[in-house]
């Protein structure tokens, strides 16, 4: 056999052929989050002696869903405040106003998020008194200038 007639072995098989483009597990699962990296973290973290092949795919899908949910709500909060850019304040408002996400992230502090606006109902003026005082005040004000 001549060295010139030899073809390089590739993914095509024994005879060689064009090298096929590798397909990531994230692409196969239709995800944006990195399945391989999450699998590596699961192994490196020693959460269990062995990690199944489906575990990092499932975890990546769950993380991607949660991220998409938070971003969707934060984007809505930014639009409500007439802003084009999501800031930590919008993330906090989105998470705290959503019942399920608020329960999931109850013990989480979001840096530069601030607090939810809240006034205790006891401190607010009563509607009946406010309506009564506003109707009486203008009538007295109109009578007093006529004296002079």
Curated annotation (Swiss-Prot):
Residues 131-142 have a biased composition (Low complexity). It holds the Pfam family Histone_H2A_C. One of its GO terms (cellular component) is nucleus. Keywords: Chromosome, DNA-binding, Nucleosome core, Nucleus. GO terms for molecular function: DNA binding; protein heterodimerization activity; structural constituent of chromatin. A motif (SPKK motif 2) lies at residues 144-147. It is found in: Nucleus; Chromosome. It comes from the Eukaryota. Gene3D superfamilies: Histone, subunit A (1.10.20.10). InterPro entries: Histone-fold, Histone_H2A, Histone_H2A/H2B/H3, Histone_H2A_C, Histone_H2A_CS. Residues 1-23 have a biased composition (Basic residues). A motif (SPKK motif 1) lies at residues 137-140. Residues 1-28, 127-148 are annotated as: Disordered. Core component of nucleosome. Nucleosomes wrap and compact DNA into chromatin, limiting DNA accessibility to the cellular machineries which require DNA as a template. Histones thereby play a central role in transcription regulation, DNA repair, DNA replication and chromosomal stability. DNA accessibility is regulated via a complex set of post-translational modifications of histones, also called histone code, and nucleosome remodeling. Contains 2 SPKK motifs which may interact with the minor groove of A/T-rich DNA sites. Phosphorylation of this motif may regulate DNA binding. This motif is reiterated in both termini of histone H1 and in the N-terminus of sea urchin histones H2B, but its presence in the C-terminus seems to be unique to plant H2A. Belongs to the histone H2A family. The nucleosome is a histone octamer containing two molecules each of H2A, H2B, H3 and H4 assembled in one H3-H4 heterotetramer and two H2A-H2B heterodimers. The octamer wraps approximately 147 bp of DNA. This is Probable histone H2A.1. It comes from Medicago truncatula (Barrel medic). The lineage of its organism: Eukaryota, Viridiplantae, Streptophyta, Embryophyta, Tracheophyta.
